[in-house]
């Protein structure tokens, strides 16, 4: 008589592996033998595939799914969502979070969300919260996290071995990272008026977008910026085809890129763009994307191209400041160029500071930050990879001296601009420092975070708002566009100070519009 089979409890990672093997065509029977489980268990895993994947995506990519065996959710799921978002934000900013602080914050959110029940943020709740999200015990001791140099060195060694083993060229190695950008954040004492709170800089998360830069180690393939805002289609986008934007735009309520958005970007944009680029270079369509350690992003196993040749690797916890390529001056350079462009735009328009600030839209910001990203030199990006690839270093790229020159030039121009005479180099230089500028602006207040969760859970559009959303967007005919272009050209011809290049651009646009109009007319006849 056969003995009773020993009960096997699979980890979430085991279940993910089984799901992957099922997709590869391996039979239920074979998997049941390999893992020592019944065929019915394998079938249950397939049945709950979506639930397992969603749970894995919300866990710590390196430890959350490798140890945990159950998928028990929180009693207060809404509170759990806002707490992990808050925790991730504190971690990203290097702000120490102790167990006491975490418990107090949970109690605050519980009250702010207007939740009902007997919740006291006990030590038991805190332990379960950490377990659910794969948060290591050391993360809650209240000491500010510093770069783990030992972990960084070990990862550099293992990553170089991986690159050699897979025979990857720098052209096939990509890095991506995100940062928050307060697109209306203007230098103090320059375009802001101390007596007017409405123009005192960025105090609201509504004036914040997330930008994600992605490029390969050569710096020769810079993908369009990924921009994430709070509104699905901001008012400034009216009449704008999102596919024509110089960036890939997504919307969400959270402070950092959420897993669903990131996965969509990876599968629908990153993979096709990389395949296209490598094909143009005559290289094998095989690549790796290096990311820092964010619990909110999908697990490594869940991110790959259909053929498995384009994959993701995560940096270990707490080494971003040391070896994440995009954090070695690339993101800071983008922000510096953006802010310089913002000031230049103000000076070119010559408007009153308050009018300029009021008229500035998120669409303006998107075009400006896209221009800033395009200005980043390939040598700057190559230099950012030097810690992972020492032999890849170049002695060029934007440095402190170049930044100082840019600040000095702008300060000189501003000092000769009405209402900005009091600006100085120190003021501009401090504003250029992405860390000091961003820290002076509130990232996402506790009340705003709770408010976003409340709106997501409770707010339903009224019949009036639904009716407004159904109104068709403004359509501009070819005839009207051609008429406006003709008028603008007439205007330019009357101006003595207009450049020939500006006139030529409009003439080229007029030709394009005429062709479109001709094609449309032929279709109608």
Curated annotation (Swiss-Prot):
SMART domains: CENPB (SM00674). Signal peptide: none annotated. Residues 28-48, 100-132 bind DNA. Residues 442-474 are annotated as: Disordered. Residues 67-139 form the HTH CENPB-type domain. Residues 168-385 form the DDE-1 domain. InterPro entries: CenT-Element_Derived, DDE_SF_endonuclease_dom, Homeodomain-like_sf, HTH_CenpB_DNA-bd_dom, HTH_Psq. It is found in: Nucleus. GO terms for molecular function: DNA binding. Pfam families: CENP-B_N, DDE_1, HTH_Tnp_Tc5. One of its GO terms (cellular component) is nucleus. Residues 1-52 form the HTH psq-type domain. Keywords: DNA-binding, Nucleus. Belongs to the tigger transposable element derived protein family. PANTHER family: TIGGER TRANSPOSABLE ELEMENT-DERIVED PROTEIN 2, TRANSPOSON. This is Tigger transposable element-derived protein 2. The lineage of its organism: Eukaryota, Metazoa, Chordata, Craniata, Vertebrata.
């Amino acid at each position: 008589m056969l003995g009773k089979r020993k009960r096997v409890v699979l980890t979430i990672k085991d279940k993910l592996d089984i799901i992957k093997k099922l997709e590869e065509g391996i039979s239920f029977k074979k998997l049941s033998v390999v893992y020592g489980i019944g065929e019915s268990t394998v079938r249950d895993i397939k049945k709950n595939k979506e639930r397992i994947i969603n749970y894995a995506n919300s866990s710590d990519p390196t430890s959350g799914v490798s140890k945990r065996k159950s998928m028990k959710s929180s009693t207060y799921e809404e509170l759990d969502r806002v707490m992990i978002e808050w925790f991730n934000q504190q971690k990203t900013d290097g702000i120490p979070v102790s167990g006491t602080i975490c418990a107090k914050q949970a109690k605050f959110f519980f009250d702010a969300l207007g939740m009902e029940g007997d919740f006291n943020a006990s030590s038991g709740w805190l332990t379960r919260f950490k377990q659910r999200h794969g948060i290591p015990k050391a993360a809650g001791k209240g000491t500010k996290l510093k770069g783990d140099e030992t972990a960084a060195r070990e990862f550099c060694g293992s990553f170089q071995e991986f690159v050699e083993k897979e025979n990857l060229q720098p052209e096939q190695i990509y890095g991506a990272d995100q940062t928050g950008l307060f697109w209306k954040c203007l230098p103090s004492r320059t375009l802001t008026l101390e007596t007017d709170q409405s123009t005192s800089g960025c105090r609201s998360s509504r004036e914040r977008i997330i930008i994600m830069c992605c490029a390969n180690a050569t710096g020769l393939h810079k993908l369009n910026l990924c921009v994430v805002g709070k509104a699905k289609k901001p008012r400034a986008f009216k009449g704008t085809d999102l596919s024509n934007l110089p960036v890939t735009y997504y919307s969400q309520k959270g402070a950092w890129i959420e897993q669903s958005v990131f996965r969509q970007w990876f599968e629908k944009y990153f993979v096709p763009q990389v395949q296209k680029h490598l094909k143009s270079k005559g290289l094998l369509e095989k690549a790796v994307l290096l990311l820092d350690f964010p619990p909110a992003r999908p697990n490594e196993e869940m991110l790959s191209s259909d053929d498995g040749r384009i994959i993701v690797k995560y940096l270990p916890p707490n080494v971003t400041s040391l070896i994440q390529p995009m954090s070695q001056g690339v993101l800071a350079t983008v922000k510096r160029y953006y802010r310089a462009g913002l000031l230049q735009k103000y000076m070119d328009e010559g408007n009153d500071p308050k009018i300029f600030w009021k008229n500035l839209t998120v669409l303006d910001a998107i075009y400006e930050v896209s221009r800033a990203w395009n200005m980043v030199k390939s040598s700057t990006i190559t230099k950012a990879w030097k810690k992972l690839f020492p032999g890849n270093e170049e002695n060029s790229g934007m440095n402190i001296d170049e930044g100082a020159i840019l600040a000095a030039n702008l300060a000189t121009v501003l000092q000769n601009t009405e209402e900005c005479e009091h600006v100085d180099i120190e003021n501009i230089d401090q504003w250029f420092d992405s860390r000091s500028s961003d820290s002076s602006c509130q990232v996402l207040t506790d009340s705003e975070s709770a408010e976003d969760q409340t709106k997501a859970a409770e707010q339903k559009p009224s019949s009036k708002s639904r009716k407004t959303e159904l109104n068709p967007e403004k359509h501009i005919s070819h005839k009207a566009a051609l008429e406006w272009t003709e008028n603008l050209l007439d205007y330019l011809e009357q101006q003595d100070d207009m450049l020939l290049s500006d006139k030529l651009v409009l003439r080229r646009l007029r030709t394009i519009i005429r062709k479109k109009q001709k094609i449309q007319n032929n279709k109608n006849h």
